[in-house]
Regions:
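AAA+ P-loop ATPase mechanoenzymes
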Residues: 1-122, 132, 169, 242
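Generic detector of ordered secondary-structure context
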Residues: 65, 100-104, 211, 310, ...
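Walker A/P-loop NTP-binding motif of AAA+ ATPase domains
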Residues: 95, 99-295
């Protein structure tokens, strides 16, 4: 079953929606006026009471109303959630294990991320300055950059906040406002922030494009004071802006996949399809998978010059065709 991830933080919701909070307070005050004989403190819990003996998850959920606001980490919007269906996130450590990149690169990423999570202290001790971990992943499409960022969030056991340039807008003022919100949420919730396709922020500034220069300056200013984990990905890097070089702790280039890597990706996807099939056997519309037949073709398939995204899309299309024709995938 697919589980979407939400951050339940009523304090942050109230900060971001002050008008709604004021309306709720006015309504509560009006109701108390109608029932003045009722002690307004009834139902309130002193925070200190829960420090020494924190309630279990089930006990805590019983104290909540039937619905609460939660921030959808995928769509980046607040949604009304039914408390009865809320459960803790199950982190997928296997995602990083299955990541198909150079072993040394994988070890390096895991080392710096693990050390960052273990320690909240950074090398820059200037008051007010950020002590963030900034990682740049650059290379062609479908080479594993975005998947690396998603896997890092899993091993760090932190929510992933994914931002694309389309989210940011094109005006410096809008970009700054959006990035400040991302920075606030990222710091408060301990997120791994992914800025996907960050080309516009990384290339060297020039006199020929003042509008883009303003965007780069805004990004650098926000970056200066961010103290979380930030991963930037780009398909191309021409000339780095000099201001970024001292801020990026880990700069990794992703090359096109070789045959062995493509074979491993095919193998991982087939294994995942088998696992999905086991969990969905009771679901109508599932017609099975002929894994042995597919595996017999993997060597030939790995010889095709495809990237990871193309391999995923091929298998996704094959599953849809299998369902449409009502026969096993293979």
């Amino acid at each position: 079953m697919f589980h979407r991830r939400f951050m339940v933080d009523m304090n942050m919701y109230k900060k971001m929606h002050p008008a709604q909070n004021e309306n709720a307070l006015e309504k509560a005050s009006h109701n108390r006026g109608k029932h003045s004989h009722v002690d307004s403190s009834i139902g309130e819990i002193d925070v200190d009471m829960t420090q020494d003996d924190p309630p279990s998850d089930d006990e805590f959920l019983m104290c909540l109303p039937s619905t609460v606001k939660g921030f959808d980490m995928k769509n980046k919007e607040w949604r009304l959630l039914e408390v009865a269906f809320i459960q803790r996130v199950e982190w997928n450590d296997k995602a990083f294990e299955d990541l198909v990149i150079e072993p040394r690169t994988k070890s390096l990423i895991k080392a710096v991320v693990t050390n960052r999570v273990r320690s909240e202290e950074g090398a820059d001790v200037i008051e007010g300055k950020g002590n963030g971990l900034f990682i740049l992943l650059h290379g062609g499409p479908g080479t594993g950059k975005t998947l690396t960022a998603e896997s890092v969030a899993e091993i760090a056991k932190r929510p992933l906040y994914k931002v694309t340039c389309g989210d940011l807008g094109t005006k410096a003022h809008d970009v700054e406002k959006y990035l400040e919100t991302v920075s606030l949420l990222g710091k408060t919730w301990g997120c791994v922030v992914l800025l996907d396709e960050a080309d516009v922020f990384l290339e060297q500034r020039s006199l020929a494009n003042l509008e883009r220069n303003a965007l780069v300056s805004v990004f650098l200013r926000v970056l200066e004071y961010y103290d979380g984990i930030l991963i930037l990905t780009t398909n191309r890097v021409g000339t780095f802006d000099e201001a970024f070089k001292s801020r990026i702790q880990l700069n990794l280039r992703y090359t096109n996949l070789d045959r062995d890597q493509r074979l491993q990706i095919w193998t991982n996807f087939v294994k995942r399809l088998e696992e999905m099939e086991v969990s969905s056997q009771q679901i109508s519309g599932s017609y099975g998978i002929n894994a042995a037949e597919i595996r017999a073709s993997l060597s030939a398939l790995a010889g095709e010059n495809l990237n990871g995204r193309e391999i995923r899309n091929i298998l996704s299309t094959a599953r849809q065709l299998s369902s449409y024709e009502e026969k096993p995938l293979g």
